[in-house]
Regions:
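N-terminal beta1-alpha1-beta2 submodule of the flavodoxin-like/Rossmannoid cofactor-binding fold
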Residues: 1-101, 106-110, 114
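Conserved nucleotide-sugar donor-interacting segment of glycosyltransferase catalytic cores
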Residues: 97-99, 112-135
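Short, glycine-/small-residue-rich phosphate/pyrophosphate-handling segment
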Residues: 128-149
Length: 149
């Protein structure tokens, strides 16, 4: 059975000018030589539209509104909600992640934060334990590997 490696690049530079993208590509090529049961799916966060989260998209913390409620919103908002779901589903479908992101101003580029906001969804990638001290529990950690370059 073929597994998926999701390559997430977060740099506006072309690969030949980006150290993080160059190292990531070299790693992926070497990895695929050894593990040929993986296929690569790429997402470039500078080319891909990443929705900015709006309050009306959510019914609860990190929980996108239902399909039925989304239909009550303007088409533009419905499109954004579909994109959020699509990005989250794409992330969930991978067994391994390679993230190529430079360090800018002691952090990573803003599109990566926007992407993380889209994929961190209750009952999909996390669960929220309510109580006096609420806890966030990762759902996918037991079978996923992530390499940040």
């Amino acid at each position: 059975m073929e597994k998926k490696l999701l390559y997430i690049s977060v740099n506006s530079k072309p690969e030949e000018l980006s150290a993080s993208k160059t190292v990531a590509r070299s790693f992926i090529n070497s990895f695929l030589e050894k593990y040929n049961d993986f296929k690569v799916e790429e997402v470039d966060l500078y080319k891909e539209h990443i929705p900015r989260l709006e309050y009306q998209y959510f019914q609860d913390r990190n929980c996108v509104i239902s399909e039925e409620d989304a239909k009550k919103l303007p088409e533009k908002d419905q499109k954004e909600i579909r994109k959020i779901r699509e990005l989250c589903d794409q992330f969930i479908s991978a067994e391994m992640y390679v993230i190529a992101a430079p360090m800018w101003s002691l952090s990573f580029p803003a599109p990566l934060k926007e992407y993380i906001d889209c994929i961190v969804q209750t009952d999909k990638t996390i669960s929220l334990e309510k109580g006096k001290k609420p806890k966030v529990i990762a759902i996918l950690f037991h079978k996923r590997n992530c390499i940040a370059i």
